């Protein structure tokens, strides 16, 4: 009915408006009252024609928008990508819904803009709902045409609540739950072990990668589920997939998904066992124990300050050695030694997350290495992990187990230095993202280490 009530020109303008909403995460909010004008960028998301976002509460000189909106809820806003091809200007009325700690509407924003969680963690924020009253859409992506003006009537709202409503795609929630960005940890360890073997079977390597990635995905999903059930993850948590926190999936469905992934990984493991023998099964069972009981009861290695050791073993020596065995049908100390740098940097990723969350974990009564060491000790621990990764690489080259191509990893030294500076300056913004920048270091270090082994194998 909404589509029939609108002219073709209006419908075209609304579709352009929806595209602007979809492709942007921030808007410039302009409020004014009694001669005071304030403008700044705020995170936002559109739902059913309304715009939801957060502004600062009045505290320590902050809260300019709050003071203006309380006296005058009429605002202006601009949404653009700093490129004058398609942008939106608008007028509307803002309703301050309440403190972000108390309003469930925060999850409407967090689903699309998880970066907003970071600001909610460090600044006092209020959730707002903006009802647009007039929109001006400029769309020069295909042709030069006049700016379209849209009076936001009930018919327009019905269009956003009907034909233009964003329909969540179920697969996206599952994909978000597996946290695919972390898969390079598994990828590099498996490639390293395989490339070190005397002979290489590409079909077996692909099967090993499939099993390893399925196992990694299942561990990520199950960890989210058990962290949520234990109460370790709250709406302010930065390290989880947020699938449960933001209500994208019910807990039972996520648990089922994790179990299905684990069964698929087990199927691949049994296939490799049939092809290469029982040692594959023993290594897989050891890795499965460390992964599944990382967060799940009754063990919960993560909460007994054993998470670092579990992650090191599972994603370092065990994975590389298992991959090597599948190719060589035998064991060697070489993949164990060369996987140590990758395992250490994997711990550093985890530690970066725990380091940032020391206060939260301590309040919740959870024990991690970071919470036991404190801020100063955690910085030194992080330094040791990173420096040791490079040190072991040098040792491996010195004993002849890694070709000189392995020196390529030192191209990442600048990233390591940047991260170390952040680790000893907790008040810097970079410290908040220590886990992410450490993951970046791991990616490039792992890529260059595997490339060095590959070059030594095929180039000499």
Regions from the PLM with identified roles:
Residues 45-84:
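A short mixed-secondary-structure module that forms the rim of ligand-binding clefts
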Residues 241-242, 246-333:
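Intramembrane alpha-helical segments
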Residues 236-275, 367-401, 439-445:
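Multi-pass membrane catalytic core of lipid/isoprenoid biosynthesis enzymes
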Residues 192, 198-225, 281-289, 333-352:
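Membrane-embedded alpha-helical segments that form the functional core of polytopic membrane enzymes
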Residues 163-207, 211, 298-299, 304:
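Topogenic membrane-insertion module of multi-pass membrane proteins
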